[in-house]
Amino acid sequence: MTDSPSLESNNKSDMDTPRPPASSHDEHDAAESVSEKQDSATTSPTGKLEPEYLTGLRLGLVMFTIFVSTILVSLEIGIIATAIPGITNDFRKLDDVGWYGSATFILAAAASPLWGKLYKYLNVKWVYLSAVGIFLVGSIVAAAAPNSVAVIVGRALQGWGASGVLGGTLIVINYVAPPRNHPLLIGTWMAVFMMSTILGPVIGGAFTSGVSWRWCFWINLPVGGPIVVLLLLFLRVPKHVKPVPATWKEIILNLDIPGFCLLLVSLVCLTLALQWGGQTKTWDDGSVIATLVLWILLTIGFFIVEWLQGARAMAPLSILKQRMTWSNVIFCLVSYAALYQVMFYLPIYFQSIHGQSAVTSGVNTLPFLAFFALGAMVSGGAIGKTRYTQPYELAGALIMTAGMALIYILDVDSPKAKYIGAEVLFGFGIGLCNQVPMTAVQGFSKPDEVASATGIMVMCQTLSGAYFVAIAQSLFANRMLHALNSGSDHLDVALVLGTGASELQDVFSGDDLTAVIDAYMVGIKDVFAFSLACAAFSVILTALIPFKRLPDHEKKPSKDAMASDEVKASEEVQQEKKVTV
């Protein structure tokens, strides 16, 4: 990577005329990393600017702005669940139902590392605004969709923008807030994200039944407009969080477009195979087998390309090879699998088995939300004090597994006290450990790798959704249909699949309704069993996570250490110039 022309000329001049480190302009810029979180700054004896973080009202305004942006995009993740019946009534495309949710996760997973690179090389504020803009464009496309394909395209654009907003929010927190506040702020952000995601179906149900499913997307415009204004007014990244100098050609090469394309197409192939297999086509159908084979080949190709790309890869080996990173990546993938399945299928349990409306089922998930938020803030505050992360991942995984076991034993006649108790335990456990991997990876990353590391972690979170939500949907549909065909083969399978969970009581009656509810329970139980396995496996995975104390970046290094760091940074820049053509 080369410096800009002005920096390069300065470097040449400095090499010809030796001078003290304190006056070396090029070394000052080279050593200055993208994770320095200053607003105003003081100069150290080596010429580097010491960190001074936002506090008080200024920090509060930035946090408020990015948290509101998070609410905007996270509502759309869950809102589609109750909008689907209205969409299928308009377009009559039952085969596309799975894509309305999957398209968002697929684009979010594939694009997250790209956003991390963009935040590294470009102005943080304008990249963040671009992500919000793409999300709003996707909302317009979905709201005005003349057909089912347009809805899918709109949802994909929403996922693309949402990944930039979510990743950008975590990057901004890392840049502007004091390091010891990061765990609590990330925990609070995670609570806001989860509450918005789960309340999405409630809002979607109100719009779908009261106005139109299109308002699930139109509503983003009057809400998004003021958010853009807030971002323009209050999103202030510290002055010394500067983009890494690079030409446009270098930026494009570092985006790793080949890796992005391979990952995107592989996810599409897997989703197609899981949506066809056992539902619209048999598992031994040629198209199902072909898409599964393509998924395997493309995934292998993706890893080969990532290895060949080296430092330009979407997930650079220099970041992933660190034990603190790869162990938390795996833990994140598996724990999020348990979370997503409960998040999507617990409301289905309430609506299909207990006959609750979307609004009532949303109210019954509030205990889960409340204790998730409590767990996230407890672990965030505790990590801020102790600076250790692994104990909270272990404790959270254990409590989450116990709660998941209680959720698994729920049945058609389970009383309210039973499912509320299970929710509380699971919510508190997943809340304790959910945001910790992000905190750990950011905390142990090198300053110039924070943006890329954040992109990788957001990719893991959304990739877990892309993979495991699709797997859970396939498992649920296949097991439900098998149970239905075994007990009541006279029922119309297409009608059962096309009926929303909250509408079963209106469409079916008598023995048919009983048969459908029993079949739903079989499918839901298998999904919960899968989620329980993921939760239990996450307990084992905590043994891989290092027991280390988070570094305290607020401590000012000694003069000798700063001088040594500056020399190293200058040498790295000179070396990059030699190897970059």
Curated annotation (Swiss-Prot):
It holds the Pfam family MFS_1. GO terms for cellular component: plasma membrane. Residues 24-39, 565-581 have a biased composition (Basic and acidic residues). Its main location: membrane. Residues 1-47, 552-581 are annotated as: Disordered. It is a multi-pass membrane protein. It is found in: Cell membrane. Keywords: Cell membrane, Glycoprotein, Membrane, Transmembrane, Transmembrane helix, Transport. GO terms for molecular function: transmembrane transporter activity. Glycans are attached at residue 11. The keyword Transport applies. The keyword Transmembrane applies. The chain crosses the membrane at residues 61-81, 96-116, 126-146, 159-179, 184-204, 215-235, 251-271, 288-308, 330-350, 363-383, 392-412, 424-444, 456-476, 527-547. Residues 1-10 have a biased composition (Polar residues). Belongs to the major facilitator superfamily. TCR/Tet family. Efflux pump that is probably involved in the export of dehydrocurvularin. This is Dehydrocurvularin exporter. It comes from Alternaria cinerariae. The lineage of its organism: Eukaryota, Fungi, Dikarya, Ascomycota, Pezizomycotina.
